[in-house]
């Protein structure tokens, strides 16, 4: 029973600690938005490359 107050205090300290990023950023880290934009651009290029010459509506998605 003596350990219970210590355990509760430790839990409170852990919960109140400010969130810290455990991993430091390096120069190779890429923001997620950049990856998302690259994926959208790749998808658009694939659609444009598969454009059917007979029906030009399929060339422009959306």
Swiss-Prot record:
PTM summary: Contains 2 disulfide bonds that can be either 'C1-C3, C2-C4' or 'C1-C4, C2-C3', since these disulfide connectivities have been observed for conotoxins with cysteine framework V (for examples, see AC P0DQQ7 and AC P81755).
Residues with Proline amide modification: 61
InterPro entries the record matches: T-conotoxin (IPR031565)
Secretion signal, residue range per the UniProt entry: 1-22
Tissues of expression: Expressed by the venom duct.
Origin: domain of life: Eukaryota
One family name in Pfam for this protein: Chi-conotoxin
Cell compartment(s), UniProt: Secreted
Principal location: secreted
Keywords in alphabetical order: Amidation, Cleavage on pair of basic residues, Disulfide bond, Secreted, Signal, Toxin
One GO cellular component term: extracellular region
Pro-sequence residue ranges: 23-44
Keyword Lipid metabolism: no
Sample GO molecular function, one term: toxin activity
Record-stated family: Belongs to the conotoxin T superfamily.
Domain notes: The cysteine framework is V (CC-CC).
Protein name: Conotoxin Sr5.6
Source species of the chain: Conus spurius
């Amino acid at each position: 029973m003596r350990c219970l107050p210590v355990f509760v205090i430790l839990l409170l300290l852990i919960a109140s600690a400010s969130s810290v990023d455990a991993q430091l950023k390096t120069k190779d880290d890429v923001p997620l938005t950049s990856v998302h934009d690259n994926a959208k651009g790749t998808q658009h290029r694939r659609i444009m490359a598969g454009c059917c010459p007979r029906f030009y509506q399929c060339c422009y998605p959306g």
